[in-house]
């Protein structure tokens, strides 16, 4: 803590609460789980204490100034809570010197509502567990736990999390075993917020690539792990979860019992036996049993028959690991070590990290509805492998792309007015809905005919497709909602809801309510007469004195700020507020009438309680229909959005031609004409240079890209990866023409950076990621490698780059883009027929250096390092010294060093590199270096 912060904080010392302090310290000492943050409900606000308070203050407020301290008499003098110099709280032995540093027990208070909701969301994002404690009824000193949650179990915080655009909280139960020498994962995954549960059982390789892809694509937030300390694979799973930042809990094997799993699943799914997972997925069924138990799903009867079964088919989606998500900037991840902008290059350098369109998802997500945004995120994380499914999506996008009038109608009017149906259904299902929610749902349903009319007006070659998938479904849903609409119109006062935002049962529905409403009407009529009289008293036109109603203040009069002079210095007029829309005021008589109106309103709510509950119960029976509508609207929204984004790009996107997975053996492949990086081209002051790529099987499937730094190599290889991914999502792509061969995974090794928190150097990080690629990639994969070998000596780096490139060509046979600063690698094209060279061009005419960002055929014929240094405004003396030293080295190389270098390369080509044994490969290279006395230092 800084001196200023400590001085400010130490001035705020609260009265000691010995009983609570004793309870809190015993609570902390009895639980060693440092990932749990405890909040105490103080009836109006929440308090957080100790190290929890410091953590939340820094997380949310980015400062410790909001902390206060209890000056405490510690009941345990052997332990004291003190503030360290860095502001953290620690427990230490007592001493007079330490006591002088003590401020006491840190206390942080947070308001209910928006502030509390944001902090809960932030804590869950930080992978923290949360506990809410409250005072026991009729007690002033005893506390009880009333709510708890974790990143993967947010059932008790549904109302908080659904008050925004969340993607759900997926908990995963996992069991790992070996069968016939292969790793087998039995997984069950569930999201209690969105009432989904699923199972998946699959084999994996030693690098756990399938598990990595599953974790990323299913947005797993937390894991329940079947403990098996003797299993070597189990230790690797723990490391994989830790690397992915997934908190996990180790549980005994007894928790993974399939004894009652089938029965439990049937109760949750409400389905017959035939719809349950295959019995062959025994390990997945066992994991499902664990998941159901630890989410305590069977304790809530409201869950019975309400869950939906999800299936994760490993063969349906493209594999994407965290490196690809980060390297290609597909979505925004919390890992800030990776630049959020597309790398330097094609548009004249790296983009600003503050650009809101820095990720592909941010670029595409112009959805009108929260449901659409959630579905789009799922699609971006799970690109398809089946060409027919991809073509089906492209047909929908094309239909809306070619119909501007329909697209604008849906985006500007129809979809924009549809609220969060997921949130509405969860509130109704969880019995937390209000009459206002019923009115909101009614408003959405009554707008559906407008959406239907817009769709009916569409005419194109895809007209039948729109009819079968949207029009007919929407007609059925509208028909099924007819009874709901009739109930709302009969029971809820819609006029009052629209005029005054009061959501009550119609007074005509009950004699008592009719009498109370009469009293309220009499009061409002009196206030209206006051309004007319006051306008006359103020010498203002009657239309200028308006009646303003709010649930908080009831009735107030409002005049413009310009007319405020009319009530100035007149004591009988009481100003309540001044806002942009004018000055709100009243008289004592109006204030008295407001108190009476508030009293009758409260009595009305009390008398209607039973009728309101019955209305909400009936509304809850429509939850399955709401979920169907939500799914339909989300899908429609995504297709309309993808067509919209494709049409408004600086140069409109085009529909790609799709080649099915594995059908490019006859020489076909991915060919992109005039390709562009979708996230870079939209940036301000960017004139993007489009480039071509031809990845043809057996002819040009391995492309080596050389050229100057900042010339566009990184942007070029990333844009190819993004275009392929966009096509497999079912989106149009930024190009003049594109033929995309479906790939089973995109594997990337881009950027050079240390992983200091893991104790991993730049070079080791490169080797680990590259080793993973070599073991996971197949002939149908797209591999993207950017500047491999920068983290070690020149010869080691070059040797490994050569060996890795050769292995990819000869052993894997996949598509690869290999950007490198090792120009010597370009001779691979003379040795291997599938290798082709590309380079990013630059001009050095008239002693000037200009980056052209154009990708051209052939290798780069010179180095531009000094030219780039000039662009970076290096001092002229440094530039001149560099030029002189470069000439000396070139002259030196023309003699013995150059001869040795050439001999080294000749023998180096003959080495058969083993990707599984990096040390052996390095040993072979070092022996050659020693043989020819080549110094790498």
Curated annotation (Swiss-Prot):
Pfam family, one: MutS_IV
SMART domains (UniProt xref): MUTSac, MUTSd
Major subcellular location class: nucleus
Residue ranges, annotated region (Interaction with exo1): 635-709
A GO molecular function held by the record: mismatched DNA binding
Alphabetized UniProt keyword annotations: ATP-binding, Cell cycle, DNA damage, DNA repair, DNA-binding, Nucleotide-binding, Nucleus
CDD domains: ABC_MSH2_euk
Any one GO cellular component localisation term in the record: MutSbeta complex
Quaternary structure and partners: Heterodimer consisting of msh2-msh6 (MutS alpha) or msh2-msh3 (MutS beta). Both heterodimers form a ternary complex with MutL alpha (mlh1-pms1). Interacts with exo1.
Name of the molecule in the record: DNA mismatch repair protein Msh2
